[in-house]
């Protein structure tokens, strides 16, 4: 039996070591395809000190018709909701990009020879002060609870994105739930646009796809390949994407501060239309009442391990803080 990768990786190992070591151990580049960009040499876990200093979220009163639309289509746009947070979040994201190895799970998803830059990173909400302030002081938690129809909003993680001018890398059609070690129906991503973005290069959503009951293999952003998952209940979305009806696609021109809410099960992606101006976004992932830990039959992203919980139980509050309770509403 081959030794595990973890037996050779030290806290100071560079991310590329993970790829090279996996090739050595498995003797196959194909075996590394389930790990593209899913590395960190920085501990993703928040410290107890940070958890104790979290602020008090502000409130948001959601429109009942907006909630109904979200529940029906799995996505909704709210204009200008977080305009006041654009500058701080841009500043935090810039530090994240300038010093990627100082933060958890940095990833560049432009294939060799491709132009531009497609950067993303996640699980740094407790390391970057602007991210911390947003998740703990903004109305995002209150907003999330209402759209999930949940009595509480538990932070799963944040996820930041930047596509630089010249990037022509499509984000492959996918939905987020199969990437995650959680399961359930009460969930939402709160995606804040940090730049003006034309509809042709914005994220596109397949309305109603969250209701299909079908899970699709996660996909690598760098080349669109499926993760290696041993789950007979999943299928490949690549078999379907050419048949999506245009009338079911939701794509919006965005301004800084505009906010998209979408279900973890809603299929979404982008075209490979060249990026002409920066496209940055800050997304937070929220868990509601019925969300529980689950063990996927393969790699997850983020690859969160040693959580100390059993399948079917809630995610631990010590790592994933509940930032909004229904009783907190005034």
Where would I find each of the regions flagged by the language model?
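Double-stranded beta-helix
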Residues: 199-267
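Non-heme Fe(II)-dependent double-stranded beta-helix
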Residues: 21, 27-72, 77-173, 179-180, ...
